[in-house]
Amino acid sequence: YNYYQYDDYNFDSCTAKGVCATDPTISSLQEVIIMYLKQLAFYTLKLKKRGVTNKVIKDNIINTLSGLVSNTDYSQEQFKNIIMTIYENLRQSKILYERICKDNNVTAEKLESQLKVDKQLDLNEAIKQGEKEFIRKNKLLTAKQRHLYEIMFVLIKNVCINLIQLNSYNKNCEEAYYSMLHLLNMINYRKVSPDKLKKVIESFTKINYKLIRMLHNIEIETFGIPETVEVSFSTRPHKAVLVSGSNLKELEAVLKATMNTDID
């Protein structure tokens, strides 16, 4: 793989020692998924303007983005299934958009795909395609653009995680979802100036903040105002469940499942 050929790649001692490194194969598959997701964002937004929405596709986009970077334990078969699901969403959305435009005598805007996939997707070919996309990005984008796109992707992932948590309370935020799609769609265009990207990022952070406040208020309504309490750090040999994360509804589910059991 050619990931480390570029001088400005962040290949520090942490990566060199394998502590924080990501398997190049996994990175390639992630690139493929991102390519399909940003194209799917394009057609989802076009369909939204035509009054067409799809909750299944919405859930697929949010769930894929929220777990894409945080979970590198996916097997290659799981990645293949994700790729095929997103590709099928993309294919159907593109066909529907073009049909609606044709029925309304409107010229359909096109977004050319760099990847060609069919029902018999070959995983090795997908890995090669992902590597080519990584190299292509490094050639076409300036260092500043790449860094800004990385910031955008972190924000996109963060919003998706917050949307999933919000959904656990049977709530949603369409403004945050479609703003996230607009941000993801911008990655389709290579000639966006850094200044414009900065303005878009700044605007999106405000929407994300509103989403965080919404989630915080719902948590208070559900569980009450957080209080400072003493927590024992003592341990004992016993059955226990180790939990991590910030989703209080998931924690509640664990506590209910272990209630009146011999588990700490």
What are these regions (language model features)?
Residues 1-264:
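Metallocofactor- and cofactor-centric catalytic cores in central/energy metabolism, strongly enriched
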